[in-house]
Amino acid sequence: MLRMKKICTAFLTIALCTHVLAHDDTEMKDPNRVSQEQRERKVEYGTYTVPPRNQDNGMFRLKRDVDPPCTNCVITVMSANLEYSNGTTADAENGMWLHHILFYNKANRDDICGEKKPGQRFFGSGNDRTPLDLTDGGKNKLGYHIGHNDQFFISVELMNMHFSSQDVVLTAHWKFVEEPYSEYELGTPYWFDVASCGRSDVPATNNAIFNFISPPVRLDFHGQLAYLSNHVHDGAYLHEVKKNGKIICSVNPQYSSDDGADGIVHLSHVPPCSNAGPVAPGDEVSLTASYDTTKYAPMINEDGTLEPVMGVTLAYIVKGTAPVASDSGGRFYFVVPIAAIAFIALTIGAGYVFYSARQKKEWPKWLSRRQKYQSVGTEDEAFLAR
């Protein structure tokens, strides 16, 4: 009987300990993991003279190779800027525009447009200069991997609203984590565009409400939509990303409270979306960029024509296997062992109870037979014989 009790106790202890391990798994720490701190680096990509407004609408264009800010690293935050030589910001309020800058990684093939692009598009910015923060303010351990031999390529458009040329410095601010970076998940950038794989420009309409819808892109893998960076132009009032026709990201572009150098308000921030849900093979992703130029004035060229507009979402997707169902998002690979051990423990426990009850029932019968030959010898026996 004592042996039976020990066996039951052992099984119950194992079941309880395994149950605790399953629910505390997300809190367990690997002592071999190294806590990684983000490093920061500001990079200057040259000083350029931007022509006056009456020359090609004040546009300056640049395409060139540039070095990455780090190698064998994970980039977590990216932002671009335009400055004067004294370090002050050159923006719409003082008549200078970072019209566009787009970074390509020439070491990787673009996942949507392939060879139609010079590399994988992983970061873009307009004059709103919204940072691409893959950590979502430090909430996520997410980054973009840069290999040892990766090379960047940039495509830049600067615009001058003044009628005299302006000298400006093109810069970018990077945050990154160097090896080892095992704490970070790696995102793959996917560029969704209303213009598909052509130029991102699409025609604007004055004093009208209109929208552009991108062709759906069908995915062929499992993953998580970890971060969505959105880009539109002046006149936009709504930007939506859909998966299989259902909205998974909806943002309202924000405008400055003060007029720019041209006397109208301009975009100041286009919010991103994070943790927009899972994707699976066969899912289709598209976006809709909605404009209202009756409320927000579009950009106008020097000859009175409208500048084209855009609708872009750069989505970082963490690729992986099919999701496993769980009741709280934790790791439940202990569920089957728990169920098996619990079943065994309950079976043994029930057997022990049945065995004890039977012994207690049979004891008085045996004792009465014993009394024919000798008297009751212990207090327990005397009690059971009553």
Curated annotation (Swiss-Prot):
It is a single-pass membrane protein. Residues 1-22 form the signal peptide. GO terms for molecular function: oxidoreductase activity. Glycans are attached at residue 86. Pathway: Secondary metabolite biosynthesis. The chain crosses the membrane at residues 334-354. It is found in: Membrane. It is an enzyme of class 1 (oxidoreductase). Its EC number is 1.-.-.-. The keyword Lipid metabolism does not apply. One of its GO terms (cellular component) is membrane. Keywords: Copper, Glycoprotein, Membrane, Oxidoreductase, Signal, Transmembrane, Transmembrane helix. Belongs to the clz3 oxygenase family. Probable copper-dependent oxygenase; part of the gene cluster that mediates the biosynthesis of squalestatin S1 (SQS1, also known as zaragozic acid A), a heavily oxidized fungal polyketide that offers potent cholesterol lowering activity by targeting squalene synthase (SS). SQS1 is composed of a 2,8-dioxobicyclic[3.2.1]octane-3,4,5-tricarboxyclic acid core that is connected to two lipophilic polyketide arms. This is Probable copper-dependent oxygenase M1. It comes from Phoma sp. (strain ATCC 20986 / MF5453).
